[in-house]
Regions:
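Generic preference for hydrophobic/aromatic residues in regular secondary structure cores
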Residues: 1-4, 83, 93-97, 127, ...
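Extracellular-facing segments of soluble proteins and assemblies that are Gly/Ser/Thr-biased and enriched
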Residues: 1-67
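Ser/Thr- (and often Asn-) enriched beta-sheet segments in non-cytosolic proteins
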Residues: 2-4, 14-18, 71-73, 78-80, ...
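Short linear motifs at secondary-structure transitions and domain/linker junctions
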Residues: 7-12, 68-71, 104-109, 124-125
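Acidic, low-complexity intrinsically disordered regions
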Residues: 25, 32, 51, 75-78, ...
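A residue-identity detector for tryptophan
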Residues: 29, 36, 55, 79-82, ...
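Short helix-loop boundary/capping segments
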Residues: 41-107
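Long, compositionally biased interface segments
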Residues: 98-153
């Protein structure tokens, strides 16, 4: 990284990720990716771009920043899209309509392409960071990230 958004959105499978977790049915938490896009081709600069979250599952009334929008199907998964203006460039969140504890070879290109098409970021920006884990709001004991990887082809 960094990887040009134009390359991701235009090349199927350019950036893929797999993630597997073990969850519990108590507390309030979300199991998500935190992905950062920046207009500057640097991983060392302050992010003035877009935070993209991918929520695989959540319980306890947690919800993303902003407001719920449309339901879309991207890379074979049905998502509810949320958008909020928190942070420098806002946050777009894709919330899985069928909660899951794992994804395998999830292609980030279609999600990036959607964000560009909706004007949340520009095609000239760069993917600078991909993180995954839990955001425990209350409790969280027993939540485990079992595996995580990102592949740039």
């Amino acid at each position: 990284m960094p990887v040009a958004v134009s390359a991701m959105a235009g090349t199927p499978g350019k950036v893929t990720t797999s993630y597997s977790t073990s969850t519990v049915n108590s507390g309030a938490w979300d199991d998500s990716y935190d992905i950062w896009y920046n207009p500057v081709r640097s991983t060392n600069s302050n992010n003035s771009g877009l935070e993209m979250m991918i929520w695989l599952s959540h319980i306890g009334g947690t919800q993303p920043a902003g407001s719920a929008g449309p339901t879309v199907t991207l890379d074979g998964i049905s998502w509810t899209v949320w958008y909020g203006g928190s942070g420098n460039g806002g946050t777009v969140s894709f919330v899985a309509n069928t909660p899951t504890s794992s994804v395998s070879n999830l292609d980030l290109g279609p999600l990036a392409g959607y964000a560009v098409a909706k004007g949340y970021m520009q095609n000239s920006w760069y993917l600078i960071d991909v993180e995954a884990g839990f955001e425990p709001w209350t409790s969280g004991q027993g939540l485990t990230a079992d595996s995580f990887n990102v592949t740039v082809h």
